[in-house]
């Protein structure tokens, strides 16, 4: 109840762009939110950064985490659904803009390479299996 939803401005607009989506997402309209454009540094210290990666949806994002022991981790969101998708650069079936998705894939891979980041695909069971189980967590 006291949380603030951090949402990309284009994503929020997309969520309410049709009568059907307005109805489906009506509860979100009541939530306290911070809308942003571009990348968003959550705490202003570079440790948690929401990365703009449009294509899957207009305001799709990935997440960059800098952990004291684990290093830099990138969570793909829906940019990739499986390791095979990443390796072959397959665009997900549900996608609003294939060209933007492909540009986001190039950008994501550039960031991952430049930072030497560990990439976690949240829809990939093998990636999820390697994460600590609650109440444990990455350090």
Q: Could you describe each region identified by the protein language model?
A:
Residues 4, 8-52, 100-116:
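Metallo-beta-lactamase
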Residues 62-139:
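Cap/insert and terminal regions of metallo-dependent hydrolase folds
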Residues 34-83:
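Catalytic core of the metallo-beta-lactamase
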Residues 1:
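Classical protein tyrosine phosphatase
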Residues 12, 56, 126:
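Short, glycine-/Ser/Thr-/acidic-enriched flexible segments
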